[in-house]
């Protein structure tokens, strides 16, 4: 029987849902994106796909040749695959959303508060863990990871080098004034310690300070070593940016594009950029996750599919699983297949939202009035009705339906947040208050054409540059609903359609042209470090963290007020969270469009499939699943 739609969600607000708890932010192109090159017709199975113990996952998010971490790319599908390839983090989040030391990895740990207000985390690694090539994993690999990813050498090849940002001695090490990282110590072959700055404490997610993901020093810097001294740990031997350009950045053999030695549940086998297909193979050396669970599916293939044809691909057997499916028409097509017994499905609420993301460093979207005016030009209720088909709700701030904070705040949200109901007159009032009162000739605005404003003695037009995802139903719907009202308010919307890789380079300010707005989706991580996502500190101004490039005193203060709240103080956290989303709702670095119900549709041969959004994504669910 077809699942009943969440029609009550469309009444402008919300209904309570089962609680789910909720790092850098995941970035996806509003859930649906460009079609693949379609190497296999939907009516024909792809070659070699008669193999039984493999899982083909269809994704609508374009993949990049990036398999290192979110600091190089926070693209949605790559973001999830990192956890399949890499592993043995000392601190993990459980299936219940709690943080703990991973007993598969950690033999013992100790936290000591120092007299100067700093805190030292000492962690001993279990014997017997090995890299996929059989090389033993030791504390050196963990210390190397911190030194590598905090180093000026890594920064020179395009990595932000922020891993050790919160640790004592980071500034001196990153600036190159010392080769020793004072807050990082190699205690013995299996033990390391890190000391957190007093200024970073207390922290809501303080256990995470003890967490490190190892990196294979023998691959990335084979002629280097990690040594310890009273001044802190350091890297000796050959370790230069020129070396890292080869071992990390080489597009064919570097660790970013081709990580051949890993310690996660799966090995990186291949990635075909043109076919948009990644192949992962089971890692026989993997010791298991925090529960000791190891995968049984031999091969995982991740393949780009089109939102228009992906249900046909699933029905034909060209893919086995479609994860995080959204959009009313697509969901209905999947539920029809379920009614026919062709597929099984599960659903869960989203820990994130679809959005228009603003770049707040660019004129004229550096003005909150302009951002709010654009919001007033869009009928978001109608947008949600058309796009989600009853499986979603309008969001009004930085939250998703799955968050417990949202579920405990439904009435409060409806009473306290601006819903930005479509009102072109309100948009005009905001623009006039912001100084957009002139025409092209410098005379008072006549009510026709584009508004102008005098800035530093020059007339500037009210032109918004939109980087839109290609072949994207969200972008298509926005293109039918937004331009006319913006024009009526005196704004000009210029649309440039592009693939996700090009779009992402603009978001990260690594391309020649930076746009004012993008249609995207965001996943809110379990470790929801809002104080970094909206920090004024330039170190966090980057894709994956403060991707809005917003430097606002009130928003920064509201986010940082949450940092020191103890992890178990839910009442104080909730009150501060409400204050934060209220300030966010006023500053509006994004226009939240919708948060919705995600569906996973899969072939009945896929057994024990149990995923949720941020807490237990498909990269975790794969470990429990089997092919039967």
Mark where each language-model region is:
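Surface-exposed binding/hinge segments that line
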Residues: 159-243
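Ligand-site clamp/hinge motif
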Residues: 252-257, 285-333, 483, 492
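Aromatic- and charge-enriched surface segment that lines or borders ligand/interaction sites
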Residues: 107-163, 187, 193, 313, ...
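Gly/Pro-rich hinge or "lid" segments in bacterial periplasmic/extracellular proteins
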Residues: 95-96, 210-292, 299, 429
């Amino acid at each position: 029987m077809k699942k009943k739609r969440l029609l009550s969600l469309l009444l402008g607000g919300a209904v309570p849902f089962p609680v789910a708890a909720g790092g850098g932010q995941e970035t996806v192109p509003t859930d649906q994106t460009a079609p693949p090159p379609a190497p296999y017709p939907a009516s024909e199975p792809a070659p070699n796909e008669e193999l039984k113990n493999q899982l083909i996952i269809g994704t609508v998010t374009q993949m990049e040749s990036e398999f290192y971490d979110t600091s190089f790319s926070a693209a949605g599908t790559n973001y999830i695959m990192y956890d399949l390839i890499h592993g043995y983090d000392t601190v993990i989040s459980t299936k219940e959303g709690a943080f703990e030391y991973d007993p598969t990895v950690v033999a013992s740990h100790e936290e000591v508060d120092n007299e100067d207000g700093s805190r030292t985390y000492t962690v001993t690694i279990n014997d017997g863990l090995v890299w996929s090539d059989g090389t033993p994993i030791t504390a050196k690999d963990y210390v190397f990871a911190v030194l590598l990813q905090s180093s000026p050498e890594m920064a020179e090849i395009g990595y932000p080098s922020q891993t050790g940002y919160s640790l004592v001695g980071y500034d001196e090490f990153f600036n190159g004034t010392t080769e020793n990282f004072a807050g990082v110590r190699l205690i013995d072959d299996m033990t390391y310690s890190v000391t957190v700055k007093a200024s970073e404490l207390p922290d809501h997610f303080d256990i995470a300070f003890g967490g490190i993901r190892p990196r294979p020093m023998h691959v990335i810097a084979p002629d280097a070593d990690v040594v310890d001294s009273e001044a802190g740990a350091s890297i000796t031997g050959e370790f230069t940016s020129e070396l890292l350009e080869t071992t990390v950045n080489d597009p064919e053999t570097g660790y970013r594009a081709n990580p051949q030695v890993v310690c996660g549940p799966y090995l990186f086998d291949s990635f075909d950029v043109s076919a948009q297909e990644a192949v992962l193979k089971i890692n026989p050396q993997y010791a298991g996750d925090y529960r000791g669970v190891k995968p049984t599916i031999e091969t995982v293939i991740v393949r780009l599919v089109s939102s228009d044809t992906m249900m046909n691909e699933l029905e034909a057997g060209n893919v086995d699983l479609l994860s995080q499916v959204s959009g009313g028409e697509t969901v209905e097509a999947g539920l029809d297949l379920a009614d026919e017994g062709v597929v099984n499905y599960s659903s869960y609420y989203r820990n994130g939202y679809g959005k228009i993301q603003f770049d707040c460093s660019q004129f004229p979207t550096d003005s909150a009035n302009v951002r709010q005016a654009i919001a007033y030009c869009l009928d978001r209720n109608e947008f949600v009705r058309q796009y989600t088909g009853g499986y979603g709700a309008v969001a009004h701030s930085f939250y998703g339906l799955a968050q417990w904070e949202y579920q405990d705040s439904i009435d409060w949200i409806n009473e306290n947040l601006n819903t930005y109901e479509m009102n072109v007159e309100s948009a005009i009032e905001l623009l006039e208050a912001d100084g957009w009162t002139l025409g092209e000739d410098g005379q008072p605005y006549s009510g026709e054409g584009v508004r102008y404003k005098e800035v530093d003695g020059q007339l500037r037009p009210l032109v918004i540059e939109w980087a839109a995802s290609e072949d994207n139903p969200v972008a298509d719907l926005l293109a039918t609903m937004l331009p006319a009202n913006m024009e009526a308010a005196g704004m000009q919307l210029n649309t440039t359609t592009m693939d996700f890789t090009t779009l992402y380079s603009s978001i990260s300010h690594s391309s020649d042209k930076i746009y004012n707005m993008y249609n995207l989706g965001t996943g809110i991580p379990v470790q929801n470090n809002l104080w970094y996502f909206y920090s004024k500190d330039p170190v966090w101004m980057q894709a994956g963290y403060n991707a809005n490039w917003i430097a606002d005193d009130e928003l920064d203060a509201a986010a940082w007020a949450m940092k020191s709240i103890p992890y178990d103080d839910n009442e104080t956290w909730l009150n501060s969270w409400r204050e934060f989303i209220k300030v966010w709702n006023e500053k509006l670095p994004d226009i939240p469009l919708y948060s919705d119900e995600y569906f996973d549709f899969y072939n009945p041969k896929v057994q024990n499939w149990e995923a949720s959004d941020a807490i237990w994504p498909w990269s975790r669910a794969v470990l429990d699943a089997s092919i039967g």
